[in-house]
Amino acid sequence: VQTTSGSGQPGSGSSVVVRGYGSINSSQSPLYVVDGVPYDGNISAINPNDIETMTVLKDASAGALYGSRGANGVIMITTKKGNSGKVKVNLKANWGVSSRAIPRYETMDEAGYLETIFQSYKNNQIINGGVSPELAGVAALEAMKSGSTAMLGQNEQYNPFNYSITELIDPVTGKVRSDAKLRYSEDWMDEALKSNPLRQEYVASFSGGSDKTKYMFSLGYLDEEGLLKTTKFNRYNGRLNIDSEVTNWLKAGMSANYSRNESNTAVENSSGSSNVWYSAQLMAPIFPVFEKDANGATVYDNLGNAVFDYGKNRPAGASSEWNTIATLYDDMYSTQSDNLSGRVYAELGDLKNTFLQGLKFSVNYGFDLINSAGATYYNPYNGNSVAVKGTIQKATARTFSYTFNQLLTYDRKFGDHHFEALVGHEFYKYRYDYLSATKTGFPFGGLYELDAATTITGASSYQNNYAVQSVLSRLNYDFADKYYLSASFRTDGSSRFYKDNRWGKFWSVGGNWRISHESFMSDITWINNLSLKASYGVQGNDAILNGTKQNFYAWQSFYDLGYANSSMSGAAVTSLENKELKWEKNANLNIGIEAKLFDRVSATIEWYQRKTTDMLMSFPMATSLGFDGYNKNVGSMRNTGIDLTLGIDIFKDTPFTWNLTLLGSTIKNKVLQLADKPEIISGSYIIREGETLYSFYTATAAGVDPATGEQLYWAWDTDENGVKGKKYITNDMAKATACKEIQGSRIPDLYGSINNTFKYKGFDLSILCTYSIGGKVLDGIYNTLLYGNYVGQAKSKMLERAWKNPGDITDIPRIEIGKSYIVTDNSLIDASYFAIKNIALGYSLPSKWMKSIGFDSARLTATADNVVLFNHLKGMDPQYNFTGGTDFGYVPVRTISFGIDITF
């Protein structure tokens, strides 16, 4: 199982992939099942304190009951239930403080930045201006000061030093004079981040009941401040679980969960000035956040507030006429959602000592309802809506889904023979309704309603519907607790396919041999358990994506009814229908061994192969044809790997205990076949037959020319038959771009976790570490800091070793204003890392103390999440996503928290 760090945005969650890429363009997400019924709600709406157990089902046999929706694995969540007896009350409180979980990228300070920019201007004067090296320094300083390439603003208002630029930097050495003093120094990223944002959570639960009826009721509140100023997340939630044995032949129960989520968010994952993670990280250190007077002192308004500098005279690369810190306060991004989930079941039968013994009929119904509303507001004074005097967009969405199944089971044991048979029917329905409107033109700022704006610029509404109907069956058999066999068959019908291809047939078989229960093993006492298991099955997948969103009408043509044509209405076809579209199939083979040795060591090793055929993809088309693409079954892919689990009770049955759990996984991915053409290229990525999915595809660097400082590349010529010639070195970027090569992928060679749990009397300590070895990352932030050519952007400290003079030996080429760069293998960073993810220390007060004051138990805790990350590049988050790219996203946060847990 692989997880990403996800966004550090409060309330956001991580992504999960089970055993590699399941498809080329379909959803990779596993199915979440809560209390036996598939769950479509927000995972963040479930209070972790309400969860009793969580289990991951990986192979086809284990997940067969969940059909097509479980093709990418199943995560089973069971919530807490009540117990018979008197009412038990549990109270929990946690208080924490957060900070950045990863350090910042190493960038240049004011002096280093100006020295680097000077070198860039100087190189430009020599290469493009025809100026001699002896005079280029003086010319560079003049160009920095005035003219079309000036970067210091009017009258050098953005020169942070107490000398004019022509006096500040030596034109020969390129160094800032030693006696220069800073007039101001402000860090945009520091100004954007909150100092020690707080997190507090409170939970109260009540459980109890009789022998016949049991209940659990809980309430929770979470208040989490974001690391980025103005961002936050609040959650109010309640859960009620009831289970009742109504008669000796009828059991029934229900669970209901309500959650109110409220978020103030911020733009992320984009290279736009409205994204603070982009603008603040890339703002050169010479530009102040607040206006400065002639002496470099901050300017204040009549109310004593510092006046933001909106950069009217800043260069374009420094977000001219924009202050991204000000937009944190002046703009608004808010969402609210009400999440309601319900589960109801009734189970009839299993009458003892009758011919109906072992026969049960159960009915399960579960629904998930999400009503959400969001608002995006851009102020009229600063930012991207100044020209239209501000913008407001409001949107509402309603998601409703339900699953209804009826299951008939027969479970009997005859001597050493145990049979369990199941047949059932299931229906799943999903509906999504969306409505939004956008207006511009406000008389002044701070108005967050549509009525306050004057001009309607957009209005949109749409509805998505989706349904799946299934008939399912399963047979389990075991003999003498030694031999286990299972088989399942189901047929699923999906509304995403045309009627001729709507139904898919899927099946699985599996077996388990408990070798340790054989008579010939009876004398081997040090083997407590030894099992050999194997399974094979085929599951279906219909979850094709359109971009990052689900495509609910996969086989049909799409029409754009909002096509711009003055005041005339009409429709334009945007994608083609494909009635031949059919189920994607995942064939899973799993072979494993489980062992328990010396009553101390447990181990599991599994080898798996997952072959995907008829892969679903939104296939790209040439835009000249008038269509973006169409949906198609495009080929096949294979994942193979090994999962290893090792648990050791290093010390047990003593006052001090120590348990060590090691997890390790490998995965190898190969695209076996693509329809129509052997490869699909997208920027620096390629999907090619015979290679790993989403392989990096870039030019190959061949060093830096010591004489000129130019980047060199490996290239080759191709003859008329397409045969590649011998490689040679060139400085021609166009040639290098035409000679791209596969440079690896994000997929690691080995990844896993290490968990240590220590206990001594009332104390317990757990330390969870995760690791990944191998794979590569294309870090967009680092590469922009290193190769970005916009004047006004911050620069990486790595540029200190960039080429400057003939004879320099280095791996970083000369820097030059306006010079373009291409992505090479030098841009890829080793993705290996080791992270201490969680440290939890607890102390349970002695029970006799608690009993004396009427408490059952009391526990004190201290927890640290995202403690430290060790990797190959300071500032990089190699856990960001599964494809190996990084963007300007909300950094993950480290949280230190303290709590108390009382039961009475």
What residue ranges belong to the model's regions?
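Residues embedded in well-ordered regular secondary structure
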Residues: 1-14, 24-26, 30, 83-229, ...
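Extracytoplasmic beta-strand/coil segments of soluble accessory domains associated
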Residues: 1-35, 53, 63-80
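Glycine-rich, aromatic-lined ligand/substrate-binding cores of catalytic
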Residues: 745-778
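Extracellular/periplasmic, surface-exposed regions of secreted and cell-surface proteins
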Residues: 28-29, 235, 241-250, 255-260, ...
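Short, glycine-/polar-rich solvent-exposed loops and beta-turns at beta-strand/coil boundaries
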Residues: 2-12, 44-49, 66-71, 231-234, ...
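Short beta-strands and strand-coil junctions in structured, solvent-facing domains, enriched
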Residues: 1-2, 23-25, 39-41, 60-65, ...
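Conserved small-residue
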Residues: 90-177, 632, 651-746
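C-terminal beta-barrel architecture of Gram-negative outer-membrane proteins
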Residues: 765-834
